[in-house]
Amino acid sequence: PPPPPPLFSSRRRHTRCQIQSRGLGDVYKRQVLAGDAYYSNLSDFFFQVVFVATAMSIVSGAVAERMKLWSFFLFAVILTGFIYPVQGYWKWGAGWLDAAGFLDFAGSGVVHMCGAAAALAGVLLLGARKGKYGPQGQVNAIPGANLPLAALGTLILWLGWFGFNGGSELKVSDVGEANAVALVFVNTNMAAAGGLVFALLLSRLWFGKADLTMALNGALAGLVAITAEPLTPTPLAATMIGAVGGVLVVVSIVMLDKLKIDDPVGAISVHGTVGIWGLLAVCFTNPDATLGAQLMGIVSIFAWVFATSFVFWFAIKKIVGIRVSEEEEYEGVDISECGLEAYPEFTSAE
């Protein structure tokens, strides 16, 4: 009988990962799964492991400073083991979204919007940090603890994105594919630069200050925006796609605060709002893309991830709770949950 369909496939050159939903045991038996002279199915599997970890890391930023550690770990198992693979199969497993013509090269929707939708569901049930919003609706800034470290983290992400997008070609077997990877690298970098510059300019015009956190999120927004299709745009088009992402992330962060949706690092805006823009932007550069298919992918992925995440977050909240106590939040979750201080150099001994 014919084998069952693969769990994931690459969007790229019609190569399909043969790691099947019933075949994960092959990985644990350390059997080398078939590929060809230039492509390994096992490398495709590893990419999916990294991608789902990326989606879960988006959630971690949005629920920071008030989430129970073990409740977070429990949801991580659910997202990585169930929620993500289902919608991942829809596109990268030759599923119905792939058949419908939905395009997502490296995961603006499958990875980034997925993580943002799961984060939004959790944040709505979790609530805002204490003191974030005043009784009259005012938004109180809670500055990050270490901006140089945040800048370093953004640089690391920027560099890592070359592997995220360029590696999504999955194989380099001839000069054409080598040139394709090089173009992906260039477009990825240009989009990040465009996002950073335009987020910085908008924050200066809007707030009167060159906001570093907005600039850093602008760079990430540019990267997310180009992830859906980094191969077909020209470098100039990639810059503009990233620039629009940089503008959108600033507007989205401000609007979410007005709605009292507390996202400490702007993860929902960076990966959700801009992830949607990235999927729509494919229509401007890829002649194979259709607006209908892209909208279908956006709605279906968001609806699946948000609905299932909300159900599981709600169940966890009712069974074990998801939020630390007010005293633990004031003390710091690093101390209350882990028994360690993240920044002991700033704590005076009594």
Predicted regions located by residue number:
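Single conserved hydrophobic/aromatic residue that forms the stacking wall/gate
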Residues: 1-28
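Inter-helical loop and helix-membrane interface segments of multi-pass membrane transporters/permeases
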Residues: 22, 26-47, 90-107, 136-137, ...
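Hydrophobic alpha-helical hairpins/lids featuring a short glycine-rich hinge
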Residues: 38-77
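Structural signature of hydrophobic alpha-helical transmembrane segments
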Residues: 41-50, 181-192, 236-243
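Transmembrane alpha-helical segments of multi-pass membrane transport proteins and ion-pumping complexes
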Residues: 49, 53-62, 80-89, 116-120, ...
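Cytoplasmic-side transmembrane-helix entry/capping segments in multi-pass membrane proteins
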Residues: 68-76, 210-219, 266-269
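Core mid-bundle transmembrane helix pairs that form the ion/substrate translocation pathway
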Residues: 132-195
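Extramembrane terminal tails and long inter-domain/linker segments of multi-pass membrane proteins
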Residues: 132-142, 316-350
